[in-house]
């Protein structure tokens, strides 16, 4: 779930925090390592109730092309957020132009929001959004590792336990 979890956040935000109804996925382990058993690449295809689809693809393999980007293809254009900037092409074309006197660092901005909430005594609670986003990532992992379509309800009601059974401090731990 750690792989590209924030890309899953972006998909949820693009869908106005509505969670997908199901997903399918493919993935695997290309590069054997000294231990470990998690996928080093996965692609998840999320489906929303309105028929919209969102795709998340990632890999953790040295020497490969790397990009973190969000592209939303709509009927009137394409929105794109990459390390090179943000823009919309099509009917409502737009390009982000940073103001020289403003901060845009995401870490600075999240800290400013936190400090403002403390000073104003207003709770800042993203718990529900974070829980749903994490569950969305878990649902994608479940689909990838099982090769099955997984619904939101199946993921929520799953009894899957990935923790090794550790009965003592001397118990062997599978890597």
Question: What is the meaning of each model-derived region?
Answer:
Residues 1-175:
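Contiguous beta-strand/loop segments that form the cofactor/metal-binding neighborhood of enzyme cores
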């Amino acid at each position: 779930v750690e792989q590209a979890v924030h890309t899953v956040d972006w998909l949820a935000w693009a869908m106005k925090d509505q969670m997908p109804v199901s997903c399918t996925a493919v993935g695997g382990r290309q590069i054997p390592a000294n231990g470990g058993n998690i996928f080093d690449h996965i692609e998840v295809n999320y489906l929303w109730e309105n028929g919209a689809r969102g795709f998340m693809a990632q890999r953790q393999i040295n020497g490969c092309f790397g990009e973190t980007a969000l592209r939303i293809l709509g009927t009137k254009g394409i929105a794109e957020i990459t390390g090179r900037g943000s823009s919309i092409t099509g009917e409502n074309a737009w390009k982000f132009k940073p103001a020289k006197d403003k901060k845009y660092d995401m870490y600075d901005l999240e800290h400013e929001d936190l400090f403002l909430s403390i000073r104003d005594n207003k709770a800042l609670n993203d718990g529900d959004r974070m829980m749903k986003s994490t569950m969305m990532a878990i649902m994608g992992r479940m689909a990838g590792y099982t090769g099955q379509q997984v619904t939101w309800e199946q993921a929520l009601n799953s009894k899957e336990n990935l923790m090794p059974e550790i009965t003592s401090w001397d118990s062997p731990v599978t890597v």
